[in-house]
Amino acid sequence: MSVLDRFKDTSKYDRVMRELGMLIVLNRAQRQEPGLFLKKKDADRCGWDGDPSDFPEADERVETFGSDGAEEEGIFFKSPRLVILRGAYKDDITFVENSKERNMIEGLYHEVNHLYDRWKENHPGQPSPYRRRRLVLCYLVDKNGVPVHKKPLYISMHGGASKVFCQRYAQFLEQLEGAYAKATNDKSAQGFGERMCASVIWTPTFGAEQYGETQKSPIAVPQSWLIPTEKSIFSFW
């Protein structure tokens, strides 16, 4: 019996929930290319034990962040292999953050969305500081579908990047549901529930697209992915 085994008794040695690591969406025009980036500190936070070679297009690199151009080491993913646990469906919980208060979370979107109207009434003609923030909980997995870190990561998005990400993920799920129905000889394709969706492997390849109604700007979005078919269905689990 190892000395470590004593700590498995959580009634004596309780555990705590720590802050989760984040996958950053690289979408600014000056970036080398769009995709997801895992900072080294977030790799440590999630218990990373993978390697860039576990993924179709990934490598170790240095990226700059913030107005001071701080450099961060990490891993870049052009085509991350994702298992999405929660947050990427359009009806999943989102939050309202206040950009004037250092991105402080004001509350759940469906509970505090009146803040937008109140701002328009009190500050006519001024841009709203409120943004709808989406957090997508996920795992990065190897080619066998095994997570390469011990704790889940989250992807934080807002605006067009969030909207398009959800649309493309929903499109992928619908393709997979159709392929599943063919593979199982079901008469009709039915939508997957939460638990089934949380077991699916999605491998999007990110690219840049112009987004905006009046003034367009580049955003990083999933542009393509492995299309599910009756023959390839098993590779998505």
Role assignments for model-derived ranges:
Residues 230-237:
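Extended, charge-rich, solvent-exposed interface segments
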Residues 1-153, 189, 215-219, 227-229:
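OB-fold ssDNA-binding interfaces and closely related basic DNA-contact patches used
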Residues 132-227:
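Extended serine/threonine-enriched, polar tracts that run as long, contiguous segments within proteins
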